[in-house]
Amino acid sequence: MTFRKSFDCYDFYDRAKVGEKCTQDDWDLMKIPMKAMELKQKYGLDFKGEFIPTDKDMMEKLFKAGFEMLLECGIYCTDTHRIVKYTEDEIWDAINNVQKEFVLGTGRDAVNVKKRSVGDKAKPIVQGGPTGSPISEDVFMPVHMSYALEKEVDTIVNGVMTSVRGKAPVPKSPYEVLAAKTETRLIKNACAMAGRPGMGVOGPETSLSAQGNISADCAGGMTCTDSHEVSQLNELKIDLDAISVIAHYKGNSDIIMDEQMPIFGGYAGGIEETTIVDVATHINAVIMSSASWHLDGPVHIRWGSTNTRETLTIAGWACATISEFTDILSGNQYYPCAGPCTEMCLLEASAQSITDTASGREILSGVASAKGVVTDKTTGMEARMMGEVARATAGVEISEVNVILDKLVALYEKNYASAPAGKTFQECYDVKTVTPTEEYMQVYDGARKKLEDLGLVF
């Protein structure tokens, strides 16, 4: 049966008021894991240890499983404790009418984001920045300037302000509103000081409420050529605050960046099951959020990292499948275990850059070093590595990529529990000149040499 009209956030709100009742425990502990397991068995999904898929028949089965996951489960609204269901025609309408390309930034600093494919020879867009990591107010500008100074970086992804005017940005307080506005204003000033005043940014990251996110669209702050973030909840869940934010973004004609990080070892379960949920989440981004692009980030439940063997496999298969069967634009965010100024951090980021570039990602977003939870532990050098590795990987045969990845991950995967803490931005850079220390440059060269030994050609 055909649909009455294209689905949007207003329809979501209406259905969230009348949908099937369900407790959150039943959703998290029964519906999601059981359906994911059922679909894995139904389609015989087995990735056989490949980071990037070479079996197109298996990719098609994965796409069908992800589509079916979304169709049969729907999305859980945490405010009303009800399930929002879509019809099959509504889902296909969203998939068939995605935003196929868009521009981030303005003037000579603008970049055109357009579809890539598995094994594409074109380098993906590099969105460099703290990626939601906490950054001290006194170094907020120089930290972001360290990314804008890197030519490998195309756009900026914001960090979180730990304070504004010396006060914590408490959700739903005046300070949250001030921080949401100040965050992007400072970053745009940092870009201007780096000689790139038209760079696009992605945020806001500091605010946690709808009023904070909405207030970031302001004079000198977020504009319609920036990526505006809204986050889905784990797994296949959302709250009504986010739906209100989507309504604002749509009404403002903003670029919408729908974000979600599926958890390996969490509610969905294992590798194949989590990838099914990841594919469903990508599709949900374009129907629920009217997303311009989806920011992925499979993360390991134990290590809090996106760079493990399991999470790279999930990311590689999900992206390749979405790229093969849809025009949905996709990015991935980076959370290494190790901190800045360490070889392990750079190698972790490199493994993910290789995976994302080869699997067809349009945007690489990072790097949130030290798992993105330690204040000031993120610098532009990690983004440089992400970009250089992406350039070296673009166009390499997938079979060769899988061999390189297997060897690369083996170099660091036994060290998660003892990952080096690394150094803060203030220890890695001259804060006044915003230049890396000699020590970090030597560490960088050492990591680059190891990548060359594995077969990457810079």
Curated annotation (Swiss-Prot):
One Pfam entry name: MtmB
Keyword set, alphabetical order: Methanogenesis, Methyltransferase, Pyrrolysine, Transferase
Pathway: One-carbon metabolism; methanogenesis from methylamine
Organism: Methanosarcina barkeri (strain Fusaro / DSM 804)
Function: Catalyzes the transfer of the methyl group from monomethylamine to the corrinoid cofactor of MtmC.
GO MF term list: monomethylamine methyltransferase activity
The UniProt record lists the keyword Lipid metabolism: no
Catalytic activity of the protein: Co(I)-[methylamine-specific corrinoid protein] + methylamine + H(+) = methyl-Co(III)-[methylamine-specific corrinoid protein] + NH4(+)
InterPro entries: MtmB_MeTrfase (IPR008031), MtmB_sf (IPR036655)
Enzyme Commission no: 2.1.1.248
Highest taxon of the lineage: Archaea
Family: Belongs to the monomethylamine methyltransferase family.
Protein name: Monomethylamine methyltransferase MtmB2
BP-aspect Gene Ontology terms: methanogenesis; methylation
